[in-house]
């Protein structure tokens, strides 16, 4: 039996905790997450359910809730539920008198996940060995508006630089993490955004980190999905051995047909007519570029190959 290495982690832009899950799946580490940071309500609830044991029964039977006014204030201070489309914060106060259990559920999920909320409102992070940083991709993804991630641009992807601010704070306090793992879409290293990525690497170097990056495709990592992502591992220079390497690509033969059921309940299907209508509505509303339109429609049986995700 392998003695697991203790690894403390801060998960920034934590989502549902897949960074943590990936580390745990290696079987090499005893992971302790000190804090998370996310503002998406569904992601926060999912994180707590997947990693912290949150259940409906727990929400109903938990006996140490503060007052509803205090819960609403706590979530508001953390900016939980902020809507980027309308640029408005969620009004938690409207749930105080209604008795709506969503207030209890989200507050408890935040507590269980040690969620600090909006990264732009965090003053400092607890010391950990590793920070994981899956910053928002909406402003650099080919499925988005390509607004960029330049520092000070106030795009969603530029929230990356708030993490750099927090890193400076930690360094000044003598609490620099040993490692930082960045992950984002392949377009991060495209001609359009490579200068910003290079600026990130230069900044990390100035702050005392050596950075190693690679574009990895899930289909060469044992997953039947054609999904390319940039991974960047930054290691503190005083502990870097120079031996960092990325895994060699491999194909274990697993295909999409091996993962899908042949008989699926009709309620899970959207027929082509409905899919076409949905795509038209999304394009008209400006939430789906025309270039993405062909992805949502079932045009052929591709189960023997790989699922494609941009």
Task: Please report, for each region that a protein language model flagged, where it lies by residue.
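S-adenosyl-L-methionine-dependent DNA methyltransferase catalytic core
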Residues: 1-33, 44, 79, 87, ...
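Conserved Class I SAM-dependent methyltransferase catalytic core
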Residues: 157-236
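A broadly tuned preference for mixed-charge, low-complexity surface segments
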Residues: 60-66, 180-189, 281-297
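Core alpha/beta nucleotide-donor-binding catalytic domains of modification enzymes
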Residues: 2-177, 186-191, 195-197
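Short C-terminal domain-edge/linker segments immediately following a structured domain
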Residues: 42, 65-69, 161-166, 173, ...
């Amino acid at each position: 039996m392998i003695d697991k290495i203790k690894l403390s982690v801060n998960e920034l832009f934590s989502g549902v905790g897949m960074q943590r899950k990936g580390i745990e799946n290696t079987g090499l580490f005893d992971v302790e997450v000190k804090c998370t940071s996310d503002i998406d309500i569904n992601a926060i609830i999912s994180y707590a359910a997947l990693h912290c044991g949150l259940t409906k029964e727990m929400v109903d039977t938990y006996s140490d809730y503060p007052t509803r006014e205090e819960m609403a204030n706590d979530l508001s201070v953390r900016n939980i539920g902020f809507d980027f489309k309308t640029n408005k914060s969620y009004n938690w106060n409207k749930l105080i008198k209604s008795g709506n259990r969503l207030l209890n559920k989200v507050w408890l999920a935040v507590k269980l996940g040690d969620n600090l909320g909006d990264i732009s409102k965090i003053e400092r992070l607890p010391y950990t060995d590793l920070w994981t940083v899956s910053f928002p991709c909406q402003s650099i993804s080919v499925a988005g508006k390509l607004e960029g991630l330049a520092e000070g641009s106030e795009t969603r992807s530029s929230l990356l630089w708030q993490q750099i601010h927090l890193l400076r704070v930690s360094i000044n306090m003598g609490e620099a993490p040993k490692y930082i793992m960045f992950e984002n879409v392949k377009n991060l290293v495209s001609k359009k955004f490579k200068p910003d990525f290079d600026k990130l690497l230069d900044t990390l170097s100035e702050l005392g980190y050596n950075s190693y990056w690679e574009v990895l495709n899930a289909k060469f990592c044992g997953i039947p999905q054609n999904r390319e992502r940039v991974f960047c591992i930054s290691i503190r220079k005083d502990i870097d051995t120079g031996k960092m390497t990325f895994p060699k690509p491999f194909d274990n033969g697993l295909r999409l047909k091996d993962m899908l059921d042949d008989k699926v309940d009709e309620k899970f299907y959207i027929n082509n007519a409905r899919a076409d209508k949905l795509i038209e509505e999304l394009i008209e509303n400006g939430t789906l570029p025309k270039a993405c339109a062909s992805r949502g429609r079932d045009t052929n049986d591709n189960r023997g190959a790989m699922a494609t995700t941009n």
